[in-house]
Design a protein with these regions (language model features):
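N-terminal binding-site loop/beta-alpha segment at the start of enzyme catalytic domains
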Residues: 1-67, 71-82
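Short N-terminal helix-initiation segments at or just after the protein's N-terminus
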Residues: 5-11, 78-80, 103-105, 150-156, ...
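Active-site mouth loops of central-metabolism enzymes
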Residues: 9-20, 101-118, 223-228
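A broad, low-specificity signal for short, low-complexity segments enriched in glycine/proline
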Residues: 25-26, 95-100, 149-151, 173-176
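Beta/alpha (TIM)-barrel catalytic core signal, keyed to glycine-rich beta->alpha loops juxtaposed to Asp/Glu
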Residues: 41-45, 117-272
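Alpha-helical membrane-targeting segments
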Residues: 71-114
């Protein structure tokens, strides 16, 4: 597989693995020649932007980040921040983007272009040692994405010199996105991609696909029939379309070893 088709998911960087381990994993990935990372301000229990910017101080890295992640303060989120406590400064930083009202993102005002501008400027400051490549809206409610809004969102991203993106789009928004906005990058679960592949393959949108490892694990548990046929067909689509990329969550030495095998031969993905 071409390394340029691999993006590293960092949802666990800062939470499941600590700061030191995150730095070690990133060093190994950069040695492999992979420098494109997918994140959001609340990934890694609120530490992800902080960790990636530390990496960016000494390396040229590309970042895809997101606005609107559906996360609010609860006991679990609070515990994870205590668990990964580094110092008071970073602990305070981890609460920077947390929301106390989980329903606020359902309001149209939350997705106002001015709100996006404020968020982007804040993200840009937090990631000032990195290059932001794509600015995603994270799972926006389906009633937000009408033609006029997407036009304004595209124009806004153009002023920031970043690619506009929609992460985890609603099924009802897909036709509008692929028929009228080929400039907007889409990030979606593998199941959604496969379900809509006939439409998507006819479009010119760039697509990033996630939940790859989760599907492999679930398929094995459920003893799904024709697994190899599905995976070979899927991987053939990826290898023959450079506009499609895989978002892979890598967070350990073991997963890095597996990633090396995938780069050597894409079919090794099925054997992970």
């Amino acid at each position: 597989m071409n390394k340029s088709q691999i993006i590293i998911g960092t949802a666990s960087w800062g939470s499941r693995i600590n700061f030191k381990e995150s730095m070690q994993v990133s060093a190994s990935l950069l040695e492999l020649g992979i420098n494109h990372f997918d994140t959001a301000p609340l990934y890694g229990s609120g530490y992800s932007h902080y960790v990636l910017n530390k990496i960016g101080k000494q390396n040229n890295i590309l970042i895809d980040t997101k606005y609107g992640q559906n996360t609010h303060l609860n006991w679990r989120e609070l515990f994870k921040r205590f668990y990964r406590f580094i110092n008071f400064k970073t602990f305070k930083y981890s609460f920077k983007h947390i929301r106390f009202n989980k329903y606020v993102r359902l309001k149209k005002d939350f997705w106002d272009i001015q709100k996006l501008n404020n968020a982007y400027n804040l993200f840009s400051d937090e990631l000032d040692k990195c290059k932001i490549s794509t600015f995603y809206l994270h799972s926006p409610p389906k009633y937000i994405l009408d033609y006029k809004y997407l036009q304004n969102f595209s124009k806004f991203c153009s002023t920031k010199n970043v690619v506009p993106g929609i992460c985890d789009p609603d099924q009802e928004n897909l036709d509008l996105l692929i028929e009228k906005f080929p400039n907007i990058k889409l990030q979606m679960p593998i199941e959604f991609f496969w379900k809509n592949r006939e439409k998507i393959l006819k479009s010119s949108n760039k697509i990033d696909i996630f939940r790859i490892f989760r599907k492999i694990i679930n398929d094995r548990k459920n003893n799904q029939h024709n697994l190899q046929k599905f995976w070979h067909e899927f991987l053939n689509i990826i290898e023959t379309n450079s506009k499609y990329k895989l978002v892979l969550g890598i967070n350990s030495k073991n997963s890095i070893k597996k990633l090396r095998k995938i780069i050597e031969n894409t079919n090794n993905l099925f054997n992970m």
